[in-house]
Amino acid sequence: MEDYRKMAEANQRRGREIIAETQLVESWEAIGAQATLIGSLSTGLMMKKLDIDMHVYTDTLSIKESFRAAARIASHPGIVRMEYTNLIDTEEECIEWHAAYRDRDGRMWKMDMIHIRRGSAYDGFAERMASRIGAVLTEETRDAILRLKYETPDTESIIGAEYYAAVLSGGVRDYAGLTAWREAHRGDSLIGWLP
């Protein structure tokens, strides 16, 4: 079972290399934004799902400036697709960027960069969740989360927060327990959940 730990370490190391190679942070900083790593890479809980998640903050949302940062990122040869969604006039008050990156080994990585207006409803939420997870995570719970992510069939779609809530709040330690926990909590919103 040591293999899943090595896989997690290698994927997390590679994810951070990709951030540097593509100059994600620098591209957003060039427009005066603050880019914050969130999600499984920020908590050390990345396993098989190769996702790089960032929240990007500015005082105001400018489509033109957001496109300027995105164009710089898209110019990296590893970026093979980039999509944009304008959610400025919604409760989220954001501009979403979703990119696909092919690494040197041919593996596809998903990059989600959510450009958020400072002071909006979701300002800092993902960062608070990551901070709380980091504060309560033990070696045993970290190992349980990584093992569950590893054991999850690739055909099954489970968001990270489900694993974290199941293990950290629900005491789940095996895949059968995760399946039962998910069934018992089907329809529950994890928006606002903190350990």
Q: Which residues does each predicted region cover?
A:
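Catalytic cores of NTP-dependent nucleotidyl/adenyl transfer enzymes across multiple folds
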Residues: 111-195
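Helical scaffold of the NTase/Pol beta-like nucleotidyltransferase catalytic core
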Residues: 1-38
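Active-site nucleotide-donor binding segment shared across nucleotidyl transfer reactions
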Residues: 24-67
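Short, charged/polar surface micro-motifs in flexible loops or helix N-caps
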Residues: 60-64, 106-107, 118-121
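Short, charge-rich amphipathic segments
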Residues: 1-11, 65, 137-145, 149
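Conserved catalytic core of two-metal-ion nucleotidyltransferases
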Residues: 77-117
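Short amphipathic alpha-helices in soluble, non-transmembrane regions
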Residues: 66-75
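Generic structural hydrophobic/aromatic packing signal, biased to beta-strands
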Residues: 28, 35-37, 73, 99, ...
